[in-house]
A protein has these predicted regions:
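N-terminal signal-anchor transmembrane alpha helix
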Residues: 6-31
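Membrane-embedded alpha-helical segments of multi-pass transporters/permeases
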Residues: 24, 73-74, 149, 166, ...
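Interfacial segments of multi-pass membrane proteins
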Residues: 48-54, 76-79, 103, 107, ...
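Loop-to-transmembrane alpha-helix initiation sites
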Residues: 138, 154-161, 173-185
Length: 215
């Protein structure tokens, strides 16, 4: 059991460190010599980066946030799978993925190297759920895409994942530990989107367009 906790803490620390590599902040600060957090919504995420800077460097943000999630979960699996306590009802890969995924998201949202001012975790989170289980990903991504296409509110689709991920996790695994981890993940997503939710309710949230809207 002692070795398990050492491995669990190591997986969490590495996943958090991976999450701290925020693509929007890195590209804006070190390539564009600017800070995406000083523009638009102030969020260090893909949507605000695209609205502010646009262009091909957006793909650099996507690549960074996707790769860090992959690395976090691969390392988490290497450290944990085969070393978890006996008797767990679910697949070991699921426990390691949810554990590493949670801390990767915390690193993305609260990066120690960027004054704990990060993004809202949707791109990294979307990558994580794809790696966890295609059924969880289908529900989360499906709900996100449907809501965004119907309403043009990225924040509405993003916020919905805070609900759909725990629900789909329970439907797929029927496991209390995985449900708890998914609720913590979903709760952080909703918390990071609390301002967007308030603006949605007030009718003042900005809609998303790939091109500037013609007035």
């Amino acid at each position: 059991m002692g070795e398990f906790w050492i491995r669990a803490v190591a997986a969490a620390a590495i996943a958090y460190f991976c999450g701290c590599f925020n693509g929007a902040v890195i590209v804006s600060k070190y390539i564009l010599r600017d800070d995406v957090r000083t523009h638009g919504s102030g969020n260090a995420g893909l949507t605000n980066f695209y609205r502010t800077f646009g262009g091909p460097l957006t793909f650099g943000v996507i690549l960074t946030d996707v790769l860090k999630a992959i690395v976090a979960l691969v390392v988490g699996g290497w450290l944990l799978v085969g070393h978890l306590p006996a008797g767990l009802p679910g697949p070991q890969e699921a426990y390691s993925d949810y554990w590493a995924g949670l801390f990767c998201l915390l690193g993305h949202m609260f990066p120690c190297m960027f004054q704990f001012k990060g993004g809202k975790g949707i791109l990294s989170g979307g990558t994580i759920v794809i790696m966890i289980d295609w059924r969880v990903a289908l529900v989360a991504w499906g709900g996100f895409l449907i809501l965004v296409l119907l309403t043009r509110y990225v924040s509405l689709g993003s916020s919905s994942t805070g609900v759909t991920v725990p629900i789909s996790t329970w439907l797929v695994y029927h496991d209390g530990i995985l449900l708890l981890l998914s609720i913590i993940i979903g709760g952080h997503i909703l918390w990071k989107h609390r301002g967007n939710i308030q603006r949605l309710l007030a009718g003042t949230e900005s809609k998303f367009y790939f091109h500037k809207k013609v007035k």
